[in-house]
């Protein structure tokens, strides 16, 4: 007599072969060449031979559940990619400041026939710099120094006058009473200057705080944010006899100078701070089943976080932050501190990654060893927060004062599905609706001891050829008609070993696997409605870790060969 046990053998074979895969009931690959007919009447019965499956690729059975962060690329590799929800922007500006002169008494220079000289005026100036200024090399002002010269009426005119100013003042043009003057090396020349008051306007292009001069000094006090400047205007003249009117009382030339310089640009070291609320967030929607089990440890081998920056500040910025993986209730699951990295001027790509390797041209790699912790437990979303972004105060450059400088940032998370040493992904599946078959079957009960005890079992054996770079571990348990788990003490489901991992697709690993299902009584057997399976795919079996291998949907397959189902004990069927 022959009976048919519908789907049991083929389902078990499928489940053995697809440790991280989707439900056997929902897939269309074939088990047509497996004979599922058993005979009754002996202590041991075996399924007839030649029971093999075709190669089963992951893509045949994995359901990505319309995931928006797991996809299969053109090469068949599984990829994880999440884009930030927005572009983040922060703006900095360093305020202009002024350097003003203090009132000083007018200077007088006695004149005489022939040559004469002396200090015509002294500018004493100071100002308060913005807090962002760390050091000053020079400032740009495009402002004027006004110099007044009074020539006494005891002369018709002064034949020659030259005014010398400190070399730290860059004076690019000058006028006297509106007429242009000759200027060379900060020396201004005038000829035939008539008696009376004259106003000279000296246009100051910039001030160099690193140049010394015997006609004055500059200083910058970083701690008190003060600049000070003293500039002497030194006059030399020549008066001929013919231009003297009153030889008895030649008197003197007098003068003073004033300035109110607004600084519009500066060269030096600065530390403006960009203020970001965050660098944004990435969400993980529609998590595939094989990543949703509580036992999943998604410690990826080398996750990459790509940060696209555009920094208009002409200074590189030192940036750091913290990434926090959170669950749906916004509770922190994992936190990773991001060390300081440099964002240069202009557009740049900074890639945070776990492994230490050389970056391709056009990118900068920053190694963050703990980056894999963010996905060990699959979060609802990942936030990039606690951003510190400050200009590098060791760089010397020119900045415009009162000008807005922007930094924009957008980040994405990407990595091939590659497991690190302690990583594991898991999947729970089931075979249901077994009761309509098993309730018709009974094992012969014991004639000694407990009359309800039985000595019978079903044993499934197969050779698993695995091309996946993961070790596959199966655990199983029964469920009753009420959907409750049946204790192992009543229905034991024993899997004898872990399926070995393949080191690469060209070198598959073959493991002989045995599953033994043993009910303790026929009552337990008759209450069996389903079998629950948990499959765990891990990078390590405790010793030999296989890391950094990309999981592939097309090339990495599993084949189940030499499937054998053995019944031990007398089996009684009631098919009335």
Where are the model-predicted features located?
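Bacterial Sec-dependent N-terminal signal peptides
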Residues: 1-37
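Extracellular/secretory-pathway and virion-surface proteins
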Residues: 24-576
């Amino acid at each position: 007599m022959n009976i048919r046990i519908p789907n049991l053998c083929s389902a078990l074979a499928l489940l053995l072969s697809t440790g991280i895969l989707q439900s056997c009931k929902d897939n269309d690959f074939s088990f047509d060449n497996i004979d599922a007919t058993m005979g009754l009447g002996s202590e041991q019965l075996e399924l007839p031979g030649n029971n093999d499956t075709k190669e089963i690729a992951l893509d045949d059975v994995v359901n990505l559940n319309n995931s928006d962060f797991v996809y299969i690329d053109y090469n068949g590799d599984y990829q994880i990619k999440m884009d930030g929800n927005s572009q983040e922007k922060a703006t900095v500006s360093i305020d202009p400041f002024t350097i003003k002169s203090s009132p000083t008494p007018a200077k007088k220079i006695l004149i005489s026939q022939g040559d004469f000289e002396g200090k015509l005026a002294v500018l004493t100036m100071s100002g308060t710099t913005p807090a962002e200024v760390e050091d000053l090399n020079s400032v740009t002002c495009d402002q004027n120094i006004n110099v007044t010269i009074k020539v006494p009426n005891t002369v018709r005119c002064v034949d020659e006058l030259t005014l010398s100013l400190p070399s730290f003042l860059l004076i690019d043009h000058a006028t006297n009473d509106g007429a242009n003057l000759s200027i060379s090396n900060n020396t201004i020349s005038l000829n035939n200057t008539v008696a009376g008051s004259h106003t000279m306007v000296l246009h100051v292009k910039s001030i160099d705080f690193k140049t010394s001069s015997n006609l004055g000094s500059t200083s910058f006090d970083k701690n008190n944010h003060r600049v000070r400047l003293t500039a002497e205007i030194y006059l030399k003249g020549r008066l001929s006899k013919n231009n003297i009117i009153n030889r008895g009382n030649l008197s003197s030339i007098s003068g003073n100078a004033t300035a109110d310089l607004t600084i519009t640009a500066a060269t030096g070291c600065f530390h403006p701070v960009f203020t970001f609320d965050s660098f944004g967030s990435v969400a993980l929607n529609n998590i595939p089943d094989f990543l949703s089990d509580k036992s999943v440890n998604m410690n990826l081998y080398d996750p990459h976080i790509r940060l696209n920056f555009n920094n208009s500040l002409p200074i590189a910025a030192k940036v750091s932050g913290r990434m926090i993986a959170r669950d749906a209730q916004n509770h922190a699951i994992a936190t990773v501190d991001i060390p300081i990295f440099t964002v240069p001027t202009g557009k740049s790509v900074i890639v945070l990654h776990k492994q230490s390797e050389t970056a391709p041209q056009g990118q900068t790699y920053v190694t963050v060893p703990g980056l894999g912790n963010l996905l060990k437990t699959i979060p609802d979303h990942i936030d990039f927060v606690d951003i510190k972004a400050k200009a590098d105060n060791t760089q010397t450059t020119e900045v415009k004062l009162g000008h807005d400088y922007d930094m924009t940032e957008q980040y994405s998370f990407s990595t091939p599905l590659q497991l690190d040493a302690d990583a594991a992904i898991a999947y729970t599946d089931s075979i249901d609706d077994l009761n309509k078959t098993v309730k018709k079957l009974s094992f012969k009960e014991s004639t000694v001891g407990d009359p309800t005890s039985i000595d019978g079992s079903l044993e499934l054996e197969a050779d698993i050829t695995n091309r996946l770079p993961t070790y596959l571990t199966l655990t199983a348990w029964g469920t009753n008609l009420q959907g409750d788990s049946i204790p192992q003490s009543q229905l034991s489901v024993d899997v004898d070993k872990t399926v070995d991992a393949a080191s690469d697709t060209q070198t598959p690993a073959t493991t002989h696997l045995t599953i033994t299902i043993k009910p303790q009584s026929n009552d337990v057997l008759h209450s069996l409605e389903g079998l629950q399976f948990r499959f765990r795919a891990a990078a390590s079996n405790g010793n030999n870790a296989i890391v950094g291998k990309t999981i592939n949907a097309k090339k990495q397959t599993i084949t189940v060969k030499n499937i054998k189902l053995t019944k031990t004990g007398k089996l009684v069927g009631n098919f009335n």
